[in-house]
């Protein structure tokens, strides 16, 4: 996670008019990058406290967990995610959060509590972690991001 965020931050700083779209863990990362670099983002069912999620998912007996030949998830990485957690959302006016209450992986209420009152949050009943009908939301997401860049 540290290297991924470091590389993304460096790339963002080299480019003009960057916007982010992050889903699940990507939503957690995007929240960090918005706070650090003030870039706009659309978050789709963002993971809250992903270190808990991964530890619950894999358990101590399965860590380190080999994701693929190039990446292994271990306790040090999960500890890092916990250390960088932001106690409150920053630059919230640059964040659109899309939640679906039928998310079978994450508890949408955690994200709703964290972002509500700060960022623009749209919470739909039903749905799933993959964000049902996402294609229908693309025009709204693009309009939000475009407005943020003006």
Model-based region annotation:
Residues 33-37:
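Aromatic pocket-lining residues of Rossmann-like dinucleotide-binding sites
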Residues 15-19:
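Short acidic/histidine-rich motifs immediately flanking catalytic phosphotransfer sites
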Residues 1-14, 129:
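Active-site catalytic motif of lipid deacylating hydrolases and related acyltransferases
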């Amino acid at each position: 996670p540290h290297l991924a965020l470091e590389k993304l931050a460096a790339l963002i700083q080299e480019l003009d008019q960057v916007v982010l779209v992050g889903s699940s863990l990507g939503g957690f990362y995007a929240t960090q990058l918005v706070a650090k670099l003030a870039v706009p983002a659309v978050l789709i069912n963002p993971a809250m406290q992903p270190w808990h999620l991964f530890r619950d998912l894999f358990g101590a007996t399965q860590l380190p967990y080999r994701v693929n030949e190039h990446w292994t998830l271990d306790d040090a990485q999960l500890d890092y995610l916990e250390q960088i957690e932001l106690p409150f959302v920053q630059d919230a006016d640059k964040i659109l959060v899309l939640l679906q209450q039928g998310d079978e992986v994450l508890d949408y209420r955690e994200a709703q509590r964290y972002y509500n009152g700060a960022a623009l949050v749209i919470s739909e009943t039903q749905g799933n972690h993959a964000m049902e009908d996402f294609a229908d939301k693309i025009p709204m997401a693009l309009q939000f991001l475009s407005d943020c860049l003006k």
